[in-house]
Design a protein with these regions (language model features):
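ATP-dependent carboxylate activation and anion-phosphoryl transfer catalytic cores
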Residues: 1-179, 316-319, 324-338, 365, ...
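Conserved N-proximal alpha/beta basic substrate-recognition cap immediately N-terminal to
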Residues: 119-255, 268
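Short acidic-glycine loop/turn motifs at beta-strand connectors
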Residues: 197, 312-316, 436, 660-662
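Adenine nucleotide phosphate-binding catalytic loops in nucleotide-utilizing enzymes
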Residues: 592-599, 603, 613, 633-731
């Protein structure tokens, strides 16, 4: 087998309007052309054994996918399946085995004999492309009886996932935004995520946001400054000092006594911290561990109690968790290493942020803890004895969390909300040591030991025990309060001829109403009338360029077939889509050989229009007119034939339509001669004018444009005759 072409779709495309992240493979089956799986006994016998995920059904939340795209079973392989279909399922199963839950795909023959199109979903683009190549090679090897090495493939995919997939905190915010129909864009080569479009966009970086104060982050990052500010505000904090050397450490120990804690002055997430130090030797080691991260080291009294994390968003406490360091419990038989291995078999544990818990690693810090207790990894722990393997309770080092949100005493709740305001953070993780979070902190002699910018959400959204909390919802509420919008109006134009002219006219109309327009054409990208890029800019990346611009509040996007076939659209939905026409141009390029296939490509655009938006279609073009049958949005038609039966039928049903009456423009007030306007030019102007005349309530952000473009203005510029029936009349 040979891969002829491999494309990555990133938005609605010819292959699927609903499924956006797709790999499109064009595979030459070569000597396996017309071969089905039942003709290859080694394939049917070995593949399910090598890749058990092939036969796994999607989880309940993907139940719709189960019926449309069921798993590939060994019975089906034995009965006979096309090899393109097998490749599709193998590519999906490889990704799922590596922790990426993808299920959708399809395959069908290409125009050339022995060539198949294989289309399947991906979670991470690089992983999808790697899975495509691996799937083709794997099926080819099995068919030809070659040796199979599957583990390196899965390891590579797993590594890609760990490198590129959102962390749990970021993903919780992104998925919450997506559930509210808020679009997102991951900025190139960055962990920064843009939520929303244009002037309405907000950004997140992990759990810092567009509203996160730089001063607040700086304060939280300097633990001495944080402690001083909290102490001045009456918040209990541990007594301590800052040292830079062993001499300073000795003075601090003489002042504080044991037990003590050492931690870097500007550290975070427990890095470099050592707690409950009981002797001078360990104090020196703690100093060295902290100075890996900061020359300045905080030495402070050790506060007895359990470790709690209080999460405050936008000034309100929204979650609390009790954290426990990574630990094992002895059974009197197995070694500490064996106990660690057993804990790591918990299916909830994985590498890094892959799952809700992180696998425990016996690192140098763990070995030091064991050494201090005269233990090694080969020691057998007595039955019932609990051994803590880390000095801090971070989830990222194997710790566990129990939700205690409903137990927080009102005094402690107020304290947490005050701390957030004192430090000046919109999202704030407050670490507290106390014997019981249900008792006021001033009664337990507990203390606030640390304040964190960019706190992790994993312990709250997926606690080991207790009720999961949707802590991302308050973040999205803060970024996009009720009544606000994340979107900007998007008008998109496609067709064989007239796209650029129509786009330019629409952009001009909208700009004349005071909007800051970004538009794309075959000549370049324009922001508020200024050309920022030149060349053919009608693809998805150019659309994203406009939608990422923070000054733009209206996008008008020329959308050509090349970009749609290359990578799909640069947006998922639009407000208005205009299709001017479909002609037999560019056939034979990118596997589009018929005008009907070209119409299917162009037809992607109107299918992305929101339900209360408009698809503006040319009623004189049979293929364009037929697009209305697949649409869920409202449809407006235009025609050069004032007696068009299609227009009449549409208008009789209450639809919006525009026609050209030869030589004369009818308006509610005037009759103006347009004898010098050519028919083709006028047709394009009709297409440009229609989206702007509707009085139907659209999103408040752009309602002013729709209603402001009154018929008199349109008559002056474009010559429109608009019909709404019953009673065929000009409006």
């Amino acid at each position: 087998m040979k891969i002829i072409d491999l494309r990555t779709m990133r938005g609605p495309s010819y292959w699927s309007v609903r499924h956006h992240k797709l790999i499109v493979l064009k595979v030459d089956l070569q000597d396996l052309a017309d071969t089905w799986s039942n003709a290859m006994p080694s394939l049917a016998a070995q593949l399910p054994e090598l890749l058990p995920e092939l036969e796994q059904t999607p989880p309940a939340e993907n139940s719709k996918t189960i019926h449309k795209h069921p798993p590939l079973t060994r019975e089906q392989l034995a009965d006979g399946e096309p090899l393109g279909h097998v490749i599709q399922h193998v590519a999906l199963a490889l990704q799922r085995t590596a922790g990426m839950p993808v299920y959708w795909g399809k395959s069908h023959p290409a125009h050339q004999d022995g060539v198949e199109f294989v289309v399947f979903s991906y979670q991470e683009e690089r992983a999808g492309r790697a899975a495509a190549e691996a799937a083709v090679q794997l099926v080819d090897d099995l068919c030809h009886g070659r040796e199979i090495q599957l583990k390196p493939i899965i390891d590579e995919l797993h590594e890609i996932r760990e490198e590129e997939f959102f962390g749990p905190s970021t993903w919780s915010i992104v998925s919450e935004a997506a559930s509210r129909n808020i679009p997102y864009i991951q900025l190139k080569n960055s962990s920064i995520i843009q939520l929303g479009y244009g002037v309405n966009q907000k950004r997140i970086w992990a759990t810092t946001t567009s509203y996160t104060s730089h001063a607040g982050v700086e304060v939280a990052g300097n633990k001495n400054r944080t402690k001083a500010m909290l102490k001045d505000a009456g918040v209990p904090v541990p007594y301590g000092t800052t040292v830079y050397s062993e001499a300073g450490l000795r003075d601090a120990v003489e002042d504080l006594g044991f037990p003590i804690v050492t931690k870097p002055l500007d550290g975070n997430h427990g890095k470099g911290a050592t707690i409950r130090i009981m002797n001078w030797e360990d104090a020196v080691e703690g100093l060295k561990a902290a100075q890996v991260y900061s020359r300045a080291v905080i030495v402070e009294q050790y506060i007895q109690g359990d470790d709690y994390r209080l999460l405050v968003v936008n000034g309100k406490l929204i979650a609390a968790a009790k954290r426990t360091p990574a630990a094992v419990k002895g059974d009197g038989k197995r070694t500490i290493q064996e106990l660690i291995d057993e804990v790591n078999t918990d299916p909830r544990r994985g590498v890094g942020h892959e799952k809700v818990l992180t696998s425990i690693k016996a690192d140098q810090h763990t070995l030091d803890i064991l050494r201090n207790q005269e233990l090694t990894l080969e020691s057998v722990l007595p039955e019932g004895q609990t051994l803590y393997l880390k000095s801090t309770a971070n989830i990222s080092t194997g710790g566990t969390a129990t939700d205690v949100t409903d137990l927080v005493h009102p005094y402690n709740l107020l304290l947490a909300e005050r701390v957030s305001g004192i430090v000046g953070l919109d999202i704030c993780g407050i670490d507290v040591l106390t014997s019981d979070i249900a008792i006021p902190l001033n009664e337990t002699r507990g203390a606030v030991i640390e304040v964190n910018a960019a706190p992790g959400f994993r312990m709250h959204i997926s606690p080991t025990d207790g009720l999961p909390r949707n802590v991302a919802a308050p973040v999205v509420d803060m970024l996009f309060p009720q009544g606000s919008t994340a979107r900007i109006p998007i008008f998109a134009v496609t067709g064989t001829n007239g796209k650029t002219t129509t786009t330019q006219l629409l952009s001009h109309i909208v700009a004349s109403k005071g909007y800051k327009v970004g538009h794309t054409t075959t000549s370049g990208i324009y922001i508020q009338g200024v050309q920022l890029q030149s060349g053919d800019c009608t693809g998805g990346q150019s659309a994203e360029f406009v939608l990422k611009d923070p000054t733009v509040n209206f996008a008008v996007l020329e959308t050509a077939r090349g970009g749609m076939l290359r990578s799909g659209l640069g947006f998922h939905t639009c407000d208005v889509a205009v299709v001017t026409n479909v002609a037999a141009d560019h056939l034979g390029m990118r596997d589009i050989y018929t005008v009907e296939e070209m119409a299917a490509v162009k037809g992607v655009l109107p299918r992305t229009v929101r339900k209360n938006g408009w698809a503006v279609l040319n009623a004189d073009d049979d293929l364009v007119y037929a697009m209305r049958e697949k649409l869920e949005c409202r449809v407006a038609l235009f025609s050069m034939d004032e007696h068009s039966p299609r227009i009449r039928e549409h208008a009789e049903q209450g639809g919006l339509a525009a026609v050209y009456e030869e030589g004369t423009l009818l308006s509610t007030k005037t009759a103006i001669s347009f004898g010098l306007i050519g028919r083709r030019s006028f047709l394009l102007r009709l297409a440009a004018g229609l989206p702007s005349i509707s009085k139907t309530p659209w999103p408040q952000l752009w309602l002013a444009t729709a209603t402001g473009l009154i018929k008199t203005t349109l008559s002056k510029h474009f010559g429109l005759l608009c019909h709404r029936l019953p009673k065929l009349r000009a409006e």
